[in-house]
Design a protein with these regions (language model features):
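C-terminal motif of bacterial Sec signal peptides marking the signal peptidase cleavage site
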Residues: 29-32
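Bacterial signal peptide processing site
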Residues: 34-36
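Residues at alpha-helix boundaries and short interhelical turns
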Residues: 27, 50, 63, 112, ...
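Post-signal-peptide N-terminal segment of Sec-exported extracytoplasmic proteins
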Residues: 39-42, 49-87, 131, 145
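Short terminal or interdomain "cap/linker" segment that borders an active site or interface and mediates
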Residues: 46, 148-156
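Compact alpha-helical subdomains of small soluble proteins
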Residues: 78-81, 85-150
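N-terminal alpha-helical segment
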Residues: 38-39, 121
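Bacterial N-terminal signal peptides that target proteins for export
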Residues: 2-22
Length: 156
């Protein structure tokens, strides 16, 4: 059977449309997965479970050296703090953890944490990340995930 130029042209046009639709669908599907891949890579960039555990230990050490911030943690169970902060960072960074601790609002209620206290604590976390060799772009990605909690920590 011979095809006319019109039939071939229609076939090519239909094939082009089908390819365009398939590419659009694939792009939409993959863009929806991009955040999952990005967050999972943050977990990996932090060193996974062991890297996060080292970071939290270093952060706790930094807190213990701070005359301004250590008093806020005087009544805190260090083992629970270590466990819950590790869970939280693991979960936020796309790791296989689920945060099972209290809300930030409940954890910080009545502590009267000022803007300066909050900023000093963030500086301590940055110091800990520096000492653990966490690259600056990775630090910024983690801090970006933690920043929304600020409103639930200051002046409660």
């Amino acid at each position: 059977m011979t095809q006319t130029n019109s039939q071939v042209s229609t076939y090519l046009c239909d094939a082009t449309k089908a390819i365009a639709i398939a590419l659009t669908a694939a792009t939409l599907l993959l863009s929806g997965c991009a955040n999952v891949v990005q967050e999972a890579s943050l977990y990996r960039e932090l060193g996974g479970e062991q890297g996060i555990a080292r970071l939290v230990d270093r952060f706790m050490e930094e807190i213990s050296y701070s005359e301004d911030i250590a008093p806020f943690f005087a009544d805190t169970d260090p083992d629970r703090f270590r466990e819950k902060l590790s869970e939280q960072i693991c979960s936020l960074s796309g790791g296989p953890c689920e945060y099972t601790g209290d809300s930030m609002r409940d954890s910080h209620a009545g502590m009267s944490i000022s803007e300066a206290d909050f900023n000093k604590t963030v500086d301590l976390l940055i110091n800990a990340m520096d000492k653990e060799g966490v690259p600056y772009p990775t630090q910024n990605r983690l801090l970006k995930l933690l920043t929304p909690m600020r409103k639930d920590i200051i002046y409660l």
